[in-house]
């Protein structure tokens, strides 16, 4: 049989068994190392209501808390919800991570390290 991926689509190398987790979308069991993981950091308050809350707030330096959620997807749900795409045979060999998406008003990139 031909091999489609160098890692067989999972991160399990010397381990015999990996505990299953449930997909966030469809709740099917998928091995923890095979699941596509996505870490989402959002404001608890939606963007439209941030200004209203900050105006009404008694504390002027109050920072709104954030919501930290780790999402686990099975392969089919990750493809369906466009978290990952299927790539050509040559593009599959490219193991560099995709460019980090950073919104317009976010922190600037860190300065380069001195030699």
Swiss-Prot record:
Disulfide bonds: none annotated. Its main location: cytoplasm. It comes from the Eukaryota. Coiled coil: none annotated. One of its GO terms (cellular component) is cytosolic small ribosomal subunit. Residues 87-97 have a biased composition (Basic and acidic residues). Zn(2+) binds at residues 23, 26, 74, 77. The modification Phosphoserine is found at residue 54. GO terms for molecular function: mRNA binding; structural constituent of ribosome. Residues 98-115 have a biased composition (Pro residues). InterPro entries: Ribosomal_eS26 (IPR000892), Ribosomal_eS26_CS (IPR047864), Ribosomal_eS26_sf (IPR038551). Residues 85-115 are annotated as: Disordered. The keyword Phosphoprotein applies. It holds the Pfam family Ribosomal_S26e. Keywords: Cytoplasm, Endoplasmic reticulum, Phosphoprotein, Ribonucleoprotein, Ribosomal protein, Zinc. It is found in: Cytoplasm, Cytosol; Cytoplasm; Rough endoplasmic reticulum. One of its GO terms (biological process) is translation. Belongs to the eukaryotic ribosomal protein eS26 family. Component of the 40S small ribosomal subunit. Component of the small ribosomal subunit. The ribosome is a large ribonucleoprotein complex responsible for the synthesis of proteins in the cell. This is Small ribosomal subunit protein eS26.
